[in-house]
Amino acid sequence: MNRSDGLVRRSVKPRENGGAEGGLNANTPDDNQDALDNLKDQEDNIDDGDSKETRLTLMEEVLLLGLKDKEGYTSFWNDCISSGLRGCILIELGLRGRVMIEKSGMRRRGLCTRKLILKSDQQTGDVLLDEALKHIKETDPPETVQSWIEYLSGETWNPLKLRYQLKNVRERLAKNLVEKGVLTTEKQNFLLFDMTTHPLSDNVVKCRLVKKIQDSVLSKWVNDPQRMDKRMLALIFLAHASDVIENAFAPLNDDDYEVAMKRVRELLDLDFEAESAKPNANEILWAVFMAFTK
């Protein structure tokens, strides 16, 4: 991998800022609060000049880590990335203020038994997220995070829940990355059939992603999950759950690799229930983490 550093500039449309301001002035209090939540989410997720980079969702970042640069497809042996991408979708919806975990109540129910409930049905503009949001909105009674990961993956024995499966997720995410200029599209022949692949076309974007993950557990390690950027914390967990985090650490020397993996294991060994109960914790994150480690 070419580890050269750089910036990928994107145009910032003036109407986006203007639209946000106009919405705050003209809409109802609920709309205003939602707009404020969205703006706060963007501020939380953009640091160190990320506004000048190609913006990727958690799903796109995990898929990009899993794709082979030249071949343009994920490992045939990776059977974890499918459910991992569904976990990304739930966390994205949580970070964008669309869903939340119900309150623990007087009985202090655990994360794994509490339901995922709708917070706002305002569309995100991302087709996959909005499709999942629609399913969550139409489901009554609500389901747990673990159940939703299974339903969205199509890994359920309940035939009535198969309609919730999100289909062709990897291909749809790859097309998003093609539109953003990160990947390209090719046809490759595999003996008896042709296969659409998506080789890397912008090495800078992937290098920045890999470096960002490496820095989070090395030079920028804070040793406190509550102080970590929530999106980066989610990316580390979900990359591990999707069995692609090794691709981010492969370029490291032996000493740095050992330190990085040790710190990832420290995160995996946390008490998720205790972390979710701390002030300002995002319960969606910890509920998804628990679903993948139970």
Swiss-Prot record:
Species name: Drosophila melanogaster
Subcellular location: Golgi apparatus membrane; Cytoplasmic vesicle; Cleavage furrow
Disruption phenotype: Lethal. Embryos display an aberrant pattern of denticles with some additional dorsalization and twisting. It is associated with a defect in heparan sulfate proteoglycan synthesis which in turn alters hedgehog signaling.
Keyword Protein transport recorded: yes
Compositional bias segments (type: Basic and acidic residues): 37-52
Principal location class: Golgi
Membrane topology designation: Peripheral membrane protein
Name of the molecule in the record: Golgi phosphoprotein 3 homolog sauron
